[in-house]
């Protein structure tokens, strides 16, 4: 009798959990949680509006506005642009400082006001015309993998918008410099920067299990950035196949590293050393994989269940107020320094981008 009762209780719990997670995929519920998280984050700012962190956040806000058509969200976008005078951050040569320009360009496409992109045009023109101004260091312009989210979409969006192919060509040049430096073809993952590239000397960095260090959010930046490139490049653009193949190769690797709870760990190849899912990297993976399914680059039968598992887990990391938790703070490598109370604006941005694609599932 006790066994029957226990089985019945477990069955009820399973049904309840399944019903709850099923609600996460109802379009109106997706819109509701997107607005809830967006509004919480807008009320709790942490950085300068044109900081790189907000480059990711406002990309998510724009995606949330496209999804919900919320007037409040659109006004938040305009308020942000007006507060910065539509300017990038200070370092013209640094990919981080033009991340916000992705959203300026998106808004310009609607509003057609030149002042919304003029500073972006000026900054990108300077970037293309001058070497990286770090004396004593020989370095490429995009020398860390996070840059592949920050810079490429701005160059490609701008090139498409103003009909200047030079921006697209330079993006391809800078992207492939970073790819050649940091992409591990065997693992199909990016090292965060040159310090994490294995050289077989005493300066190598390894995880506790002997595996190489590949950071979840770093690779999330890359995959999210690839989506934002591919959304812009014409189907017949000569170098598009390179980006499509890289996207597919990374996607296949990434799904093999998903953990049982639906999230990825801060360290992709040593999950046991980093208990607890990390939401910013997982959010960008969810966004990228969902976009790949929606655009027929990834097999639906293989990838859709992965995305659904991730979206369910991401929703479970949103508290009642709308705060997206379990986000690793700003850094450059896997850490264990986050909890349910840890949040950052880019974590919310990743969540919003993911929702904007999950809602398109049929």
What are these regions (language model features)?
Residues 1-22:
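Bacterial Sec-dependent N-terminal signal peptides
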Residues 11, 136-138, 207-208:
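Short acidic (Asp/Glu) patches
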Residues 11, 22-55, 62-83, 87-101, ...:
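CBM-like carbohydrate-recognition segments
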Residues 29-34, 75-78, 122, 126-133, ...:
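Acidic-glycine-rich active-site phosphate/pyrophosphate-binding loop
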Residues 33, 86-87, 137-141, 191, ...:
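Surface loop/turn signatures of beta-propeller and other carbohydrate-active proteins
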Residues 57-60, 100-103, 147, 151-154:
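The tetratricopeptide repeat
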Residues 116-155:
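Asp-box/WD-like beta-propeller blade repeats and closely related beta-sheet repeat scaffolds
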Residues 145-146, 153-268, 275-286, 298-327, ...:
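Extended ligand-binding clefts on enzyme/binding-domain cores
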């Amino acid at each position: 009798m006790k066994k029957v009762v226990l089985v019945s209780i477990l069955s009820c719990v399973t049904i309840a959990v399944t019903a709850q997670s099923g609600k996460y995929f109802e379009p109106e519920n997706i819109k509701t949680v997107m607005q809830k998280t967006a509004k919480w984050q807008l009320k709790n700012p942490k950085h300068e509006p044109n900081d790189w962190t907000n480059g990711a956040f406002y990309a998510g806000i724009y995606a949330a506005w496209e999804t919900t058509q919320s007037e409040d969200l659109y006004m938040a976008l305009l308020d942000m642009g007006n507060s910065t005078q539509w300017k990038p951050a200070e370092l013209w040569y640094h990919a981080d400082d033009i991340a916000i320009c992705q959203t300026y360009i998106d808004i310009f496409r609607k509003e057609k006001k030149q002042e919304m992109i003029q500073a972006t045009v000026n900054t990108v023109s300077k970037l293309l015309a001058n070497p990286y101004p770090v004396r004593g260091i020989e370095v490429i312009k995009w020398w860390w993998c996070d840059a592949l989210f920050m810079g490429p979409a701005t160059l490609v969006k701008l090139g498409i918008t103003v009909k200047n192919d030079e921006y697209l060509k330079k993006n391809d040049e800078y992207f492939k410099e970073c790819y050649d430096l940091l992409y591990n073809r065997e693992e199909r993952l990016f090292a965060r920067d040159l310090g994490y590239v294995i050289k077989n000397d005493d300066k190598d960095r390894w995880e506790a299990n002997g595996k190489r260090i590949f950071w979840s959010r770093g690779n999330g930046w890359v995959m999210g950035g690839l989506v934002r490139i591919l959304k812009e490049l014409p189907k017949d653009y000569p170098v598009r196949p390179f980006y499509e193949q890289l996207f597919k190769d990374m996607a296949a690797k990434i799904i093999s590293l998903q953990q049982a709870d639906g999230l990825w760990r801060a360290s992709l190849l040593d999950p046991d050393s980093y208990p607890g899912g990390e939401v910013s990297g997982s959010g960008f993976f969810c966004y990228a994989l969902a976009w790949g399914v929606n655009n027929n680059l990834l097999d639906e039968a293989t990838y859709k269940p992965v995305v659904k598992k991730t979206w369910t887990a991401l929703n479970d990391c949103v508290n009642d107020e709308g705060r997206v938790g379990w986000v690793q703070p700003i850094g450059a490598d896997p850490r264990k320094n986050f909890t349910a109370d840890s949040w950052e604006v880019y974590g919310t941005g990743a969540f919003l981008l993911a929702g904007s694609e999950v809602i398109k599932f049929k």
